[in-house]
Amino acid sequence: MILSGLEIKDKLGSDIVIEPYDDSRLNPNSYNLRLHNELLVYDNNELDMKKPNTASPLIIPEEGLLLETGKLYLGRTIEYTESHNYVPMLEGRSSIGRLGLFVHVTAGFGDVGFCGFWTLEIFCVHPIRVYPGVEICQIFYHTIEGKYENYKSGKYQHNKGIQPSLLYKDFEK
């Protein structure tokens, strides 16, 4: 079951944290999250899953930044979120998708207990100008049934900003 917007609002401060929160971004069954002004781009065209891949910051100016096709941009939400007792999920807004902009390549699914900013895997079909603060995606919450454990991974939990892939740590186990 997906929580309604009113349920999301009722759970704020206990089971759900969205900071900063603004009522105008609440939808019937989701909440719009905004794009931070910083992006990361990988320094190399060839990436290696078993190694850390370096990335450089890119600031989105107020007049916007033209994104190139065939390039992955890592961004993040302005909003910090926490989810306790619900499964958070992230999707691009339909208006964003209709412009050919993907906000996540595969990672739209969160875990119960996740706390942090959402890293966005931004990819465009056509060159597109993006702006800081644009409502780029929406978070929604599923109920969970049965016994469960909260998210424990240290890789992305309590992040302070954009998180490049830490998959290489899985190979160190």
Swiss-Prot record:
<feature type="binding site">
    <location>
        <position position="138"/>
    </location>
    <ligand>
        <name>dCTP</name>
    </ligand>
</feature>
<dbReference type="GO" id="GO:0033973">
    <property type="term" value="F:dCTP deaminase (dUMP-forming) activity"/>
</dbReference>
<feature type="site" description="Important for bifunctional activity">
    <location>
        <begin position="108"/>
        <end position="109"/>
    </location>
</feature>
<keyword id="KW-0546">Nucleotide metabolism</keyword>
<keyword id="KW-0547">Nucleotide-binding</keyword>
<dbReference type="GO" id="GO:0015949">
    <property type="term" value="P:nucleobase-containing small molecule interconversion"/>
</dbReference>
<comment type="function">
    <text>Bifunctional enzyme that catalyzes both the deamination of dCTP to dUTP and the hydrolysis of dUTP to dUMP without releasing the toxic dUTP intermediate.</text>
</comment>
<comment type="similarity">
    <text>Belongs to the dCTP deaminase family.</text>
</comment>
<feature type="binding site">
    <location>
        <position position="111"/>
    </location>
    <ligand>
        <name>dCTP</name>
    </ligand>
</feature>
<feature type="active site" description="Proton donor/acceptor">
    <location>
        <position position="121"/>
    </location>
</feature>
<feature type="binding site">
    <location>
        <begin position="119"/>
        <end position="121"/>
    </location>
    <ligand>
        <name>dCTP</name>
    </ligand>
</feature>
<comment type="subunit">
    <text>Homotrimer.</text>
</comment>
<dbReference type="GO" id="GO:0006226">
    <property type="term" value="P:dUMP biosynthetic process"/>
</dbReference>
<dbReference type="GO" id="GO:0008829">
    <property type="term" value="F:dCTP deaminase activity"/>
</dbReference>
<feature type="binding site">
    <location>
        <position position="151"/>
    </location>
    <ligand>
        <name>dCTP</name>
    </ligand>
</feature>
<feature type="binding site">
    <location>
        <begin position="93"/>
        <end position="98"/>
    </location>
    <ligand>
        <name>dCTP</name>
    </ligand>
</feature>
<dbReference type="GO" id="GO:0000166">
    <property type="term" value="F:nucleotide binding"/>
</dbReference>
<dbReference type="InterPro" id="IPR036157">
    <property type="entry name" value="dUTPase-like_sf"/>
</dbReference>
<dbReference type="GO" id="GO:0006229">
    <property type="term" value="P:dUTP biosynthetic process"/>
</dbReference>
<dbReference type="Pfam" id="PF22769">
    <property type="entry name" value="DCD"/>
</dbReference>
<dbReference type="InterPro" id="IPR033704">
    <property type="entry name" value="dUTPase_trimeric"/>
</dbReference>
<keyword id="KW-0378">Hydrolase</keyword>
<comment type="pathway">
    <text>Pyrimidine metabolism; dUMP biosynthesis; dUMP from dCTP: step 1/1.</text>
</comment>
<dbReference type="InterPro" id="IPR011962">
    <property type="entry name" value="dCTP_deaminase"/>
</dbReference>
<protein>
    <recommendedName>
        <fullName>dCTP deaminase, dUMP-forming</fullName>
        <ecNumber>3.5.4.30</ecNumber>
    </recommendedName>
</protein>
